């Protein structure tokens, strides 16, 4: 439903910090995002201005690190829900205007590189500009890595346990053909009719 993503035309999102000690390529790219955010935004000012958005009880334990790092002067990586993300078009315009040279240079890479940025740059910018409504995206969405949790994923789809699920595949899924057959059956169970774009 549309209200899951927007309220009064403003994106619903969670503003909460997470640790990023990783050495993976993804972790490095997230750190690149935060460098730009810290160049543009003052953490103390943002968290003071939007106190009720950053310290909202709806986030539950997902906000623990945000409370703990309140005295810390810089932004760190925000939680990155692995699901569909609402954006405002103006956010893309603003970020591109501010960091367009870096983004253009990055877009020349044929493959991900340690100097890249991710879409989380735009999301974090949007949150720092106060263009969001507090919403705990973890309360009604779930990401299932199919390599570990294919049975749980299939059950969640069939029973419609969440408003939104992300099914993350990879090349190491055991019994892939059987898992895919069961997953298709779960979707056919809840969506027996073809959608208009399939007709």
Model-predicted regions and their roles:
Residues 2-199:
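ER/Golgi luminal nucleotide-sugar-dependent glycosyltransferases, focusing on the catalytic module
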């Amino acid at each position: 439903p549309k209200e899951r993503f927007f309220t009064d035309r403003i994106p619903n999102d969670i503003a909460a910090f997470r640790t990023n000690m990783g050495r993976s390529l993804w972790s490095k790219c997230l750190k690149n995002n935060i460098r730009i955010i810290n160049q543009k935004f003052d953490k103390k000012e943002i968290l003071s201005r939007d106190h009720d958005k950053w310290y909202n009880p709806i986030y539950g334990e997902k906000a623990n690190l945000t409370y703990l790092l309140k005295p810390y002067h810089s932004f760190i990586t925000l939680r990155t829900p692995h699901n569909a993300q609402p954006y405002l078009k103006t956010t893309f315009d603003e970020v591109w205007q501010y960091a367009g040279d870096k983004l253009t240079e990055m877009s020349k890479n044929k493959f991900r590189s340690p100097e890249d940025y991710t879409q989380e740059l735009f999301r974090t910018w949007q949150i720092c500009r106060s263009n969001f409504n507090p919403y705990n995206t973890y309360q009604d969405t779930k990401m299932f890595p199919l390599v570990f949790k294919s049975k749980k994923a299939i059950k969640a789809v069939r029973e419609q346990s969440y408003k939104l699920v992300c099914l993350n595949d990879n090349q190491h899924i055991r019994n892939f053909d059987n898992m895919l057959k069961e997953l298709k059956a779960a979707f056919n169970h809840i969506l027996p009719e073809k959608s208009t774009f399939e007709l």
